[in-house]
Amino acid sequence: MSAAQGWDRNRRRGGGAAGAGGGGSGAGGGSGGSGGRGTGQLNRFVQLSGRPHLPGKKKIRWDPVRRRFIQSCPIIRIPNRFLRGHRPPPARSGHRCVADNTNLYVFGGYNPDYDESGGPDNEDYPLFRELWRYHFATGVWHQMGTDGYMPRELASMSLVLHGNNLLVFGGTGIPFGESNGNDVHVCNVKYKRWALLSCRGKKPSRIYGQAMAIINGSLYVFGGTTGYIYSTDLHKLDLNTREWTQLKPNNLSCDLPEERYRHEIAHDGQRIYILGGGTSWTAYSLNKIHAYNLETNAWEEIATKPHEKIGFPAARRCHSCVQIKNDVFICGGYNGEVILGDIWKLNLQTFQWVKLPATMPEPVYFHCAAVTPAGCMYIHGGVVNIHENKRTGSLFKIWLVVPSLLELAWEKLLAAFPNLANLSRTQLLHLGLTQGLIERLK
């Protein structure tokens, strides 16, 4: 078999560059608790307008909160809270985000609307070459000034958080598929500095729309597209030796997962699970999922169990996925016909699908989502209207587990004393706050 035949067996050519940030581009475009405490917080969406970072001490008149109820899912909507001339991150799609206890970090993105994307002030239009953080305790958006070289592949890259470091791999610039990346860029969020990770071995192809995870000290990258060719390749980067290896599973080609992009992955330490994804012309089912066994170096096909009354989740791509222990949550996405607004949970021990009672306030795809260590998921941005090619800058949060007593008390404290972050560390210690909580204020 020739090298070209081997390439074609694992990849398929499309008719045009795959979209990296939504419609209008390319052919396709914890701690949980027990008992009843805090159950009112569970599976309820809250929309967060967020305050921009404002220098100085200007007083701001806050508008009252309005409550709306959609079916059985109450949603708190907070109206525009901004001074004229200030705003949070513009609407975008194709970006990525991660979260720790203190901040949501949002990187990159795409918006072809000239005015929405910043107009003449955005040198990288229609992309966003910027890093934002949303501070949970104060509700403040802040665009981070960083040193070093920030990557220019700003749509459909992969992003993970490793300690204080953001690891970015792949992605595409404009036009989609014409300026892809295959480097690993690292940003230390404490020191606000970017660096290029020097690696050995054969790197993956220049791709975007791949999925990535860190497992046992190694970075695993699966799938993706060049814009025209879709991949089933699986690569591993040892973060200690910084050496890339392309894994060659012990499977026949017919037993490999279908080539895809804009899928998501989950893992349990032994297997990597591939969830959804597709190509410009299809979206893959979630009835059966492929799993790569790290111990046997082989792909396995796993039949999942449907919801008793509803069945399986719809096939989708461009969705989001977060994981809490052995529970995986997917939300939103696009099935080739409609934008989805549902949320599903898959248990990696039973492989049972459960549909959550909450519905996303805005069905969306090409959005990003991240979950905090305490189990609160944040969803930002994405495409909300295919025909109008419309994006959103909305930020929502939803508790996926019952919040701990500490988290409930913390949220009550922040609501009662919104200026708590303005106090000195000494004052906060005198009030009885722990060092851990004080760090979450800074």
UniProtKB/Swiss-Prot annotation:
UniProt keywords, alphabetically: Cytoplasm, Kelch repeat, Methylation, Nucleus, Repeat, Ubl conjugation pathway
Family that this chain belongs to: Belongs to the KLHDC10 family.
Region described as Interaction with CUL2: 401-442
Bias (Gly residues): 15-39
Subcellular localization, as worded in the UniProt entry: Nucleus; Cytoplasm
One BP term from GO: ubiquitin-dependent protein catabolic process via the C-end degron rule pathway
Region described as Disordered: 1-57
Role description: Substrate-recognition component of a Cul2-RING (CRL2) E3 ubiquitin-protein ligase complex of the DesCEND (destruction via C-end degrons) pathway, which recognizes a C-degron located at the extreme C-terminus of target proteins, leading to their ubiquitination and degradation. The C-degron recognized by the DesCEND pathway is usually a motif of less than ten residues and can be present in full-length proteins, truncated proteins or proteolytically cleaved forms.
Omega-N-methylarginine modification, residue list: 13
Keyword Mitochondrion: no
Record GO cellular component, one term: Cul2-RING ubiquitin ligase complex
Domain of life: Eukaryota
Plastid as UniProt keyword: no
Protein name: Kelch domain-containing protein 10
